[in-house]
Regions:
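Rossmann-like NAD(P)(H) cofactor-binding subdomain of soluble oxidoreductases
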Residues: 34, 51-129
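Class I S-adenosyl-L-methionine
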Residues: 21, 38-42, 103-107, 141-145, ...
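NAD(P)+-binding Rossmann beta1-loop-alpha1 motif at the extreme N-terminus of oxidoreductases
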Residues: 1-62, 101, 121, 151
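Rossmann-fold dinucleotide-binding core
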Residues: 4, 92-168
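Helical "substrate-binding/catalytic lid" subdomain
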Residues: 159-269
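Amphipathic alpha-helical hairpins
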Residues: 53, 60, 66, 70, ...
């Protein structure tokens, strides 16, 4: 069975790595905050303080990191240590430009797959994430399936591109629901009445996400993803949405909370 190195044990990475252990894969893990590896080590993984050491003997390297800068930094550390025949599966939300940069830096014989995920911590724990796999994923599709259904998106970078499209729609929908609820507040409507009416219409999915519980996607991550999207195309509506989430991310009580918390923040804003 393939030896796997998993780098990044945050809200998403830790439960994903558990599925690999449960499947019997020899697993080496690394995280910038080393203490987060403790529960996985107790479950049978090996932890290392050096990301290069983590990947040196790995057949498959999986990265689940905060964003493009973190991925570039880890690339500097691990690229010299990747062995020929290995696959690097980049599962962070970084956009297609970063994937192209990484592809240009791949050592001979190493395959890069961009495979960001759809879903939050609840789906990560349940193994029901949606995997958007770009590039030559044939050699790792069975491993990606440990996390949930795999959609092959095409050429390298297309998984990262489609993830930006999906997140733009989700984040924009949440902001739209927040503004609709702000209007309901201004017009004196009962929250439950407005929420139920919205939930019963075409925006039902966005309403469910705007008021979701038990999931985690922080306003800081929303800002990162919207920024990537608005750098790729002119998106006036999403530029306005970026203002909402940037304000939420500037609030230390909200920045790392799920975007459902940002809905309350948007409804309460007096400057927008």
């Amino acid at each position: 069975m393939e030896k796997i190195a998993f780098l990044g044990l945050g809200h998403m990475g830790e439960p994903m790595a558990r599925h690999l252990l449960a499947a019997g894969h020899p697993l080496v893990v690394w995280n910038r905050t080393a203490a987060k590896a403790g529960p996985l080590v107790a479950a049978g993984a090996r932890a290392t303080a050096d990301p290069a050491d983590a990947v040196r003997d790995a057949d498959v390297v999986i990265t689940m990191l905060a964003g493009p800068e973190a991925v570039r930094e880890i690339a500097d550390a691990i690229l010299p240590a990747l062995r020929p025949g290995a696959h690097w599966v980049e599962m962070s939300t970084v956009g297609p430009d970063t994937v192209r940069e990484l592809g240009e830096r791949m050592p001979a014989g190493v395959t890069l797959v961009d495979a960001p995920v759809m879903g939050s911590t609840d789906k990560a724990a349940a193994g029901r994430l949606g995997i958007l796999a770009g590039g030559d994923a044939a050699g790792v599709e069975h491993i990606l399936a440990r996390f949930g259904p795999v959609t092959r998106t095409g050429a390298p970078g297309t998984g990262a591109a489609l993830k930006l499209v999906v997140n733009t729609a989700v984040i924009g929908g949440v902001a739209l629901v927040a503004e609709a609820m702000k209007l309901a507040d201004a017009l004196g409507l009962a929250e439950g009445t407005a929420r139920d009416a919205l939930a019963g219409g075409p925006l039902g999915g966005a309403v469910a996400r705007a008021f979701a519980e038990g999931v985690h996607f922080g306003s800081d991550l929303a800002v990162k993803d919207i920024t990537l999207a608005t750098e790729s195309a002119r998106l006036p509506a999403m530029e306005a949405v970026l203002g909402h989430f940037a304000a939420a991310a500037a609030d230390p009580d909200v920045v790392h909370e799920d975007i459902a918390r940002a809905v309350t923040h948007i409804r309460a804003r007096r400057d927008a």
